[in-house]
């Protein structure tokens, strides 16, 4: 047949047609079905109808454009193409119907599709009985988008996509399958060729430095068993073990453990140590090891460093089998500007702000999400819901919330753009955080969220309907800074800083707080937690034991970074395993034993956890003994008899006959003494119990051990 090439044909050949379906594939013309196919490397092509009818497709352009016709009604056919000496039967991607429905497009345009991960990305499926993969990507300003991969020899002319409403490009690729590697080849709005892009919605990716996305069949992922239903309840104990999966342990020198290898040891260790939760530093795919995961390029993909999505499911399941909740560090505040990532995705600032005063972090050299764009907010909120639903995650800790809330965060006076009211609050980010929390808790009421927020922003952990940001918890950065500053001082100087211990209780119940001794406190020259302790060797370890005991007795949930539980000496290094050999030395094993027992006590004594976030759960008893560095307080539970008396002595002196008033007469049992010889201490104490003195007011006469804290509970 004679084919006159039109402008539309050249638009397809030159890769600038927004809807190649309008030209390629089957088209009814003059009682025939005209078939056009673009197969750049083919030497001959036939169309074979479903009833066996065939038509020779003539090469009408040297770039591989073929055209011919079948009898009317032959819209289902295959292409029989010869490549050199090989002949293969191919399904024509341009004969299949659209993937996205009109309702899908409506929700996508409105930004209210909570299951974006069911629509966008790469999804293995059968369409009209043909197996393949449906690819959908957002690129509203692109002139052309092609999907390239293992299935088309990475040729961008083979599978040009069509644009639908609101800038979503789609294509069903017959024969593509789970495990295939792919990217999007994008031509920008001015005809410029962009770097090939990874899929923003990819469920897996190649190991760095490679950057291709990998097709995953999400419907075949095993569903981890659920964690205990009330594990995140406000009145339940919450003690979190923060872990960087790549450096907890290593094998054969310096090789990572896989997700499945970690599943064999890490959950059992966390359980043995008495922690209720584990929190992973970000597991989303990221190109740079040294970012620790905080500069992600693949928010929907568990990093391939440690295995596949199926392997990651196995790790979550192993934790849930031990009754341990799993929290993820989640990074919706910024992303790196790697060429294959989200930055300048369609040739414009699609995910980020175009103005660098709004769109770039000066400190980190990363790009900031544009929370004023509905597609971006939908992308992020759907990502949160994705982890909770598909992997059964029990909560999300949101990184760097302060950097999201303030437009002038870490910027010079002339380096930021005020909001519409002239203020520095990022109104769009506030709305995003509220929507994120509202949708998470509406769909998953038993999970939790936590904010790393380092300023005094009010009502971070108050419900959205009451004007708050809606988080379940907020990290208590003020407590962490004040108490670490206090404990790092020589005991002789601590009396001048007595208020650093007291001050935290002035605001301890203004939020639902987590007390964080996180990874940020053991890097960048800050030294390890043990490394901050003053004095000789005995005092350093005693100080650390006293500090940990103080932390577990203080109101608020607990978080401890890996290695701190046994007194790691070195700063954390993401390229090395923790120094597990230290546990061969009794003083480090003693620290580990103390943390294990503190976790046990915290979990089993209602007074230590039931009212963690309620002022009725705490009462100061001794606040004015600065000269002796002694504090005493009472922790309370729901039951009037649920009481725990705590005395902390941050001096190296022993105090005999130390008087403390208590609410009940009778015997008080010494539930824990951080100076016990079991933990490496001097074994000064009260022989396990003490009786109240005779008198009108119940009072205890105690022996207070040096650099230690003791816990006493009333006998029934």
UniProtKB/Swiss-Prot annotation:
Reaction(s) catalysed by this chain's protein: Transfers a segment of a (1->4)-alpha-D-glucan chain to a primary hydroxy group in a similar glucan chain
Protein's UniProt name: 1,4-alpha-glucan branching enzyme GlgB
Xref: SUPFAM superfamilies: (Trans)glycosidases, E set domains, Glycosyl hydrolase domain
Entry function: Catalyzes the formation of the alpha-1,6-glucosidic linkages in glycogen by scission of a 1,4-alpha-linked oligosaccharide from growing alpha-1,4-glucan chains and the subsequent attachment of the oligosaccharide to the alpha-1,6 position.
One Gene Ontology term from the biological process aspect of the record: glycogen biosynthetic process
GO molecular function, one term: hydrolase activity, hydrolyzing O-glycosyl compounds
Annotated family: Belongs to the glycosyl hydrolase 13 family. GlgB subfamily.
EC number of the protein: 2.4.1.18
InterPro entries: A-amylase/branching_C (IPR006048), Branching_enzy (IPR037439), GlgB (IPR006407), GlgB_N (IPR054169), GlgB_N_E_set_prok (IPR044143), Glyco_hydro_13_cat_dom (IPR006047), Glyco_hydro_13_N (IPR004193), Glyco_hydro_b (IPR013780)
Keyword field: Carbohydrate metabolism, Glycogen biosynthesis, Glycogen metabolism, Glycosyltransferase, Transferase
Pathway stated in the Swiss-Prot or TrEMBL entry: Glycan biosynthesis; glycogen biosynthesis
Record-annotated active site: 399, 452
């Amino acid at each position: 047949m004679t084919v006159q090439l039109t402008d539309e044909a050249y638009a397809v050949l030159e890769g600038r047609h927004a809807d190649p379906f309008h030209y390629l594939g089957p088209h009814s013309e003059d009682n025939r079905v005209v078939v056009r196919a673009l197969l750049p490397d083919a030497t001959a092509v036939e169309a074979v109808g479903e009833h066996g009818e065939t038509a020779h497709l003539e090469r009408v352009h040297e770039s591989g454009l073929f055209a011919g016709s079948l009898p009317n009604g032959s819209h289902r056919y295959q292409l029989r193409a010869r490549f050199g000496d090989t002949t293969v039967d191919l399904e024509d991607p341009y004969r299949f119907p659209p993937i996205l429905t009109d309702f899908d497009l409506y929700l996508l345009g409105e930004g209210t599709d909570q299951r974006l991960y069911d629509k966008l990305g790469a999804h293995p499926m059968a369409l009209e009985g043909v197996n393949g993969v449906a690819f959908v990507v957002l690129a509203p300003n692109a002139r052309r988008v092609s999907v390239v991969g293992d299935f088309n020899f990475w040729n961008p002319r083979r599978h040009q996509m069509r644009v639908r409403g609101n800038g979503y490009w789609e294509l069903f690729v017959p024969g593509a399958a789970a495990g295939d590697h792919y990217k999007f080849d994008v031509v920008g709005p001015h005809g410029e060729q962009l770097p090939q892009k990874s899929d923003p919605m990819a469920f897996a990716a190649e190991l760095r430095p490679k950057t291709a996305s990998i097709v995953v069949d999400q419907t075949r992922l095993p569903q981890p068993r659920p964690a205990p239903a009330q594990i995140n309840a406000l009145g339940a104990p919450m003690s979190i073990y923060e872990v960087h999966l790549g450096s907890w342990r290593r094998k054969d020198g310096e090789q990572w453990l896989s997700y499945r290898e970690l599943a064999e040891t890490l959950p059992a260790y966390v359980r043995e140590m008495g922690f209720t939760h584990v929190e992973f530093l970000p597991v989303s795919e990221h190109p740079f090891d040294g970012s620790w995961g905080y500069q992600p390029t693949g928010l929907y993909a568990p990093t391939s460093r440690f295995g596949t999505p199926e392997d990651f499911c196995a790790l979550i399941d192993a934790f849930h089998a031990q009754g341990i909740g799993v929290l993820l560090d989640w990074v919706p505040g910024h992303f790196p500007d790697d060429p294959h990532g989200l930055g300048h995705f369609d040739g414009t600032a699609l995910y980020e702000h175009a103005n660098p005063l709004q769109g770039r972090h000066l400190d980190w050299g990363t790009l900031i999400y544009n929370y004023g764009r509905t597609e971006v907010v939908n992308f992020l909120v759907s990502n949160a819901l994705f982890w909770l639903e598909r992997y059964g995650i029990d909560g999300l800790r949101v990184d760097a919330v302060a950097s999201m809330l303030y437009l002038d965060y870490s910027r010079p006076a002339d380096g930021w753009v005020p909001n519409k009211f002239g203020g520095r609050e990022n109104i769009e980010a506030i709305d995003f955080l509220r929507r994120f929390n509202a949708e998470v808790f509406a769909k998953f009421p038993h999970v939790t969220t936590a904010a790393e927020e380092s300023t005094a922003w009010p009502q971070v952990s108050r419900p959205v309907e009451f004007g708050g940001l809606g988080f379940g918890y907020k990290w208590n950065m003020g407590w962490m800074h004040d108490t670490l500053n206090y404990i790092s001082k020589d005991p002789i100087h601590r009396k001048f800083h007595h208020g650093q211990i007291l001050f935290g209780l002035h605001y301890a119940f203004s939020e639902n707080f987590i007390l964080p001794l996180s990874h940020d406190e053991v890097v960048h020259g800050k030294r390890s937690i043990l490394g901050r302790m003053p004095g000789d060797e005995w005092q350093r370890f005693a100080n650390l034991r006293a500090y940990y005991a103080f932390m577990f007795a203080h109101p608020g949930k607990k978080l401890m970074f890996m290695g701190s539980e046994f007194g790691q000496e070195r700063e954390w290094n993401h390229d090395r395993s923790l120094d597990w050999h230290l546990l061969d030395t009794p003083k480090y094993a003693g620290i580990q034993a103390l943390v294990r027992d503190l976790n046990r006590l915290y979990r089993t004594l209602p007074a230590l956890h039931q009212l963690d976030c309620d002022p009725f759960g705490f009462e100061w008893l001794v606040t004015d003994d600065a000269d002796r560095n002694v504090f005493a307080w009472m922790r309370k539970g729901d039951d009037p008899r649920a009481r725990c008396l705590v005395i902390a002595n941050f001096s190296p002196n022993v105090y005999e006959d130390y008087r403390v008033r208590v609410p009940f007469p009778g015997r008080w049992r010494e539930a824990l003494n951080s100076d016990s010889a079991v933990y490496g201490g001097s074994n000064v104490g009260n022989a396990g119990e003490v009786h109240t003195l005779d008198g009108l007011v119940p009072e205890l006469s105690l022996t207070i051990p040096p650099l230690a804290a003791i816990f006493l509970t009333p006998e029934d």
